[in-house]
Structures are given as structure tokens and as C-alpha cells.
Amino acid sequence: MSNLEHEAERVEMAAATTEIRQRVLELRQLVQRASYAYYVLDAPILEDVVYDQLYRELQDLETQYPELLTPDSPTQRVGEQPATQFVSVQHRIPLYSLENAFAVADMQAWQDRWQRQGQAIGEQSATLRSPEYVCELKIDGSALALTYENGVLVRGATRGDGVYGEDITANVRTIRSIPLRLDWPDPPPIVEVRGEAFLPLDVFHRLNQEREQAGESLFANPRNAAAGTLRQLDARIVAKRRLDFFAYTLHLPLASARSATQPAAAQQLDLLAVAQSDPAVAAQQLDLSSASQAESVTTHLPQTQWQSLELLQQIGFRVNPHRQLCPTLADVRQYYDHWNHGRLDLPYMTDGVVVKLNSLRLQEHLGFTQKFPRWAIAWKYEPEQAVTEVLNISVNVGRTGALTPVAELRPVQLAGTTVSRATLHNRDRLAELDLHIGDKVVIHKAGEIIPEILQVFPELRPADARPYQLPTHCPECGQPVVQPVDEAVTRCLNVSCPAIVRGAIVHWVGRDAMDIDGVGEKLVRQLVDRGLVNSVADLYRLTVAQLLTLERMGNKLAEKVVAAIAKSQSRPWSRVLYGLGIRHVGSVNAQVLTTAFPSVERLMAASAEDIEAVHGIGPEIAQSIVQWFQTPANHSLIEQLSAAGVQLAQDTVAVPPSQLPQPLAGKTFVLTGTLPTLSRDEARSMIGQAGGKVTDSVSKKTDFLVVGADAGSKLDKAGQLGIPCLSESQLLELLEET
């Protein structure tokens, strides 16, 4: 072939490549536009068959020419490989929670507070007298923080504790109403969008039907289903569940937010906030790379929350269509009343109304408390109630032998779900209600999750209604039950009780204990009912042949179960101790105890005084441990576990409690609110183990206040005294650093 022919071929190939590149870009634009119209605007512009043809053509070209594949392509929403874990990430701008209101008086008090704050900072009285509010539905889902760099989605994270969340980008990319690339020419270098991921009701009901047919446990409500879906390690499962997303907040992080090692208040880090006071400084802080970017960003910045929502919609997001501008608090009340009655007609769950001051300038001036923005509030719906009839009262027996009475109800719709059971807690609650079988009762969902009986109508009690008394014998094993002194709980003390055995094994195989994959409640029930397992030690004697006698058990699955059980033999001593299910010994306490007593022999030989000497371990825990090891059946269990090869010691040398590291020695802590992952006892134990002291009230002697959700007056007092506040993650960091 001549040089001329070579050159002609090269030119022809280059032309073909250019043509293909152009076609790929064209297909991406078509598919993205069609997806936006379908998933965001709910106004399809292409027939499904045409969309599928275009999508497949794009997919084929990207496979044939992998150099043309980019992360923002619509074909890249779902990855092929499941993740192994989620990584903790710090939010550039914190995700604040909202203050809650439950009545008109709460809303009026909130308005009075922000108006007083406005007067204190010199805000014009006309602005304070005539505010404008934006009302939005409070979607009952999971909050997400999305980060875009140069217009491309690079990170999706959960809310977490508001400072740290989990990176779930692969899962976020599967949500079709979240754009992979913003429809924003010359966007700012970094754009952050906050919103709510949720499961539409029709998808939720279909998902539960599929789970029921597969013999899997049902999701309690769409919120739990959405949260559980987002935490799936396999994005392919997430994609199948068809989550949706509404955006409600736009942030344009300044350079200071991108370089900060500790999060600051949102108004100090966001261009939209800073620009309300000094647009020139804000544009300078953005580090814009071109004049066109500067003009595009700084000349079209929203001045109001309403404009922010409109901009979010313009750049590709779905924004809730039921938002409304309200000139007065009276208009806000009308909006609330409308949706309080009309919420069940929506195709998704809501749990209230979010009310925000419309002016971004006023938002910036009012700022934040340590927990909430002063310029926004969540007006929660009243818990939905319903009247129904008690058909029967049954009793559940837990792993500790506790008998919990449960009311069996005539099925009724409550907060969007069918309710047929309600907990009665214990003997004292039964006595307080004076409940009879046949009574008409009012039920509600505590926190709109757990059904419980709120009120009994004795005047409507039928003549044949029967009073109820807790059984004197265990309904599972028939042995007499006891009422421990100073406890409202009635207990079965038979360690061979099937319910206690099942509960103990389910606890043992759980994620925080031995983490035995493939062994769930249904399999445990079969194993106990068939007499194959009577204690956790029996798990380690199971064979494939025995498992094959169970329902829905094939050879491959049986081999996996046996392998998973064998793998658990190497779990550390701290997990074993927690897995034993000793009352009051949580996972954190177990770690503390196994540090002080690095073998089961050392712990068995310890007195209550020895155990109580460990920082963070109180007399109740110490006595519970001593009593557990004094029981002959538990001695036998330890011997069987040892023979099975389970780790009952750790390699470290025992350290006397008095010589354990005490990095927080001399520091006094107070706990308030609900922490994301730790219980109060676990946090108290960790602080005590490190030498710190936890007290119940805030004073000048308090060094740190550890703050969780729904913190109370302790937070206000700490603010008045200038006491530093820590989130759970900051407490854990402090413990790790020291």
C-alpha cells in the first residue's frame, strides 16, 4: 500500500472516529433529556421502545469504543461489583436537623424567637413585620448530600450525625431522578445539593409483596425500606428498588469549606449565604477558573429559597411540586391543615411540613443555633390515631425470658400501613390500661413507627369482655414464670425454653456478635424445632447432612452455612463475650471487659468487686456477670465452646484495671439526646474506661457535652456556660487520638 493510500485510510478512520464520538454525545443528550422528562418532569417525550433502542445503541458504542466511556454517561448508573463496606466521609457543610413544632402555639413561639433575634442584630423592622415563608412537604425518607465537581456527580453521602456520613455514591447513582451531570453551563467548581431519597408507596407495596413471596421479613414502612435500600452493598439491588429523590437545598461551597478540616456553620461556608452580604468576596472565594464562570454564577444567584428551588429544577433535579409561598403564619397554618388531611392521597409518605423564611439574606443574618437553623422549623403532623377492637392478647417470650404481652387487633389502617398488633410492654402497663379482650381502644404509632394502645373505652366494653392476666406458666415451655423484685417484667427462667434458646442463638449469630452469615431467625427456628440445636455450642456440631433435612435447604447453601459457622470460631474474645447474651453486657462493655480480663478463665474467677473496678462498669453489670458464671449450665456451655475451638481469650497480656490507660482522666462529661449508634450506657462505659467521669447535669465543672438528636435543655445551658459540645463521631475521635 502506498503512502498516499495509508494517509487516505488514516483520514477515513479519523473521520469515522469523529462521527462515532459525535453520535455518542448525541445519544447521551437524547437519553439524558428523555430520562429528565420521565423521572423529574413526569412528562415522557419518548416511547419506552424508542428509549430502549437509543440506550442500547449508546451501550454498544461505549463497549466497542471504551475510550469514549465517561462516568457521567447514563449507562453508568449501576456498577457491576458490590461494595465491601461504606466509608465515613465528612460533610463540607454540616447537615443541621430541624426544630420540631407540634401546634400553632409552637409556630408562634418560633416566629417570636426569630423576630427577637432579628431585632437584636439590627434587622429592619419592616422585614421582621412582613416575612414571607416557603412551605414544603416533609418527605419521610432518608436525607442525602450530593456533591458535584465541575457539574459531574462525584459523591453521594448519608446524613449520618450531620458532620460525618457514609459514602454511598454507587447507590445514589442508581436513582434516576438524580442527575449524573448538572444541566448548568459553566457551573461552579463544587455544587452541593441536599434532599430526601424515598420509596414511592406503590414501589414499597410491590417490594413487600415480593419479600413475602420469597419468605423474607417485611419492611415496616417506606422510610425503613428506603434507609435499608441505601445501605445495600450491591448497587444492582438498589437499582431494582426504584428509589426517588426530591431536592430541597442548594449549597455552593466556598474555598474555605473545601479546605476546612473541621466543619463550621453553614452560613460561613456557602456562597449563597455570603453573597447576600458581599457578592464580590463570595465570587473571589469560589476560585472560578474563567470569566464566563464568574458571570454565570455570580449574576444569577438566587436571592430567596423559592428561587433556589427553581434553580434546582432548572439544573436537572426533581423538586416537590406542592411547595407554596405563604405571606403570613395564618397562611402557613392553612397549608399545614390542607396537607395534614390530604397527605394520604399522596403517592409517598410525609410526616409534616417544613417552613423556611424565604429571604436568603435574612437566613444568613439569623444563622444557626448549635443544633438548628433559626430560620426554619418542621411542623410535624399529629400522630395518626384509629379506633379498633382487641381480639386477643398473646405473649412473646424473648431471649432473656421476658414475657411481653401483645394485643391482637382487628386490622386497621394507620399512617399508611395495616396494623393488627400492638405492644402492651409489661404487667404494669396492662394494669394501668385495665385491658379486656373485646375492648374498643384507640391506637397510635409512637413516633409513627411502633403501634401502641393509647386509650381504652370501658364504657363501650361488651358484657362478655374478658379481663386478662399474664400467664403463670411460660407459653413456650410450660415452666412457672417469676416476677423479679423491682422489675415490671415477668420472666421464664428455664434456660432450655425454646424461645430463650432461639433468642440466644439469634443473638449469637448477629452482626455485632459472631456475625454468622446465612443463619437468620427462620433457620434458627427450624434448627431448634427439629432438635438439631439446643445451645449456641450445638451450631459448631452441625453437618451438611443435618442441614439438608430442613426446608428450602440445598447442598450448596448447607455447605455455605457450615463454612460460615466454622469461620466464626476465630472471632475475637470480645465478640464471644457479647454473643453470650449476659444481661446488661453490650458490645462496648464487652470490649472494655475483655481488655481488663483477656480470657474467660480470668473473668470467671473475678469477683463482683474486681469487675466493678473496671472503669465504666457499674455494680449492676458486675453482679449480672458473676451470677451468669455461677450457673452450672453456663459453665457447661463455656466448656463446649472451648472444645469447639471458639476463641475464649485474646493474645494481649492482662492489665489490672488500675493500670489501664486513662486519657480522659480528670475530664467531666454530660450526655444529652439520642446518639446515632451508641446507647447511653455504652457511651458512659467508653468514657469511664478512658478515665473520664459522666454526670447528669451541666455545670461550670463540665468539660464536654456530648450531643445527640433531640437534645434537651442541657444544650442551652452548655451554650450559656461556653462548654464545648461534641458529636458522637467527635467523641470517638477524641478517644482514638488520646
Curated annotation (Swiss-Prot):
Top-tier EC class: ligase
Catalytically driven reaction(s): NAD(+) + (deoxyribonucleotide)n-3'-hydroxyl + 5'-phospho-(deoxyribonucleotide)m = (deoxyribonucleotide)n+m + AMP + beta-nicotinamide D-nucleotide
GO molecular function terms attached to this record: DNA binding; DNA ligase (NAD+) activity; metal ion binding
Binding positions (Zn(2+)): 474, 477, 492, 497
Keyword field: DNA damage, DNA repair, DNA replication, Ligase, Magnesium, Manganese, Metal-binding, NAD, Zinc
Ligand binding (NAD(+)): 48-52, 97-98, 136, 159, 196, 356, 380
UniProt entry tagged with the keyword Zinc: yes
InterPro entries reported for this sequence: BRCT_dom, BRCT_dom_sf, DisA/LigA_HHH, DNA_ligase, DNA_ligase_AS, DNA_ligase_CS, DNAligase_adenylation, DNAligase_N
BRCT domain: residues covered: 659-738
Database matches in Pfam families: BRCT, DNA_ligase_aden, DNA_ligase_OB, DNA_ligase_ZBD, HHH_2, HHH_5, Nlig-Ia
Top-level taxon in the UniProt lineage: Bacteria
EC number: 6.5.1.2
Cofactor(s) required for function per UniProt: Mg(2+); Mn(2+)
SUPFAM superfamilies the record matches: BRCT domain (SSF52113), DNA ligase/mRNA capping enzyme, catalytic domain (SSF56091), Nucleic acid-binding proteins (SSF50249), RuvA domain 2-like (SSF47781)
Record-stated family: Belongs to the NAD-dependent DNA ligase family. LigA subfamily.
Its biological purpose: DNA ligase that catalyzes the formation of phosphodiester linkages between 5'-phosphoryl and 3'-hydroxyl groups in double-stranded DNA using NAD as a coenzyme and as the energy source for the reaction. It is essential for DNA replication and repair of damaged DNA.
Alphabetized NCBIfam families for the sequence: dnlj, PRK07956.1
Full protein name: DNA ligase
Native source organism of the sequence: Cyanothece sp. (strain PCC 7425 / ATCC 29141)
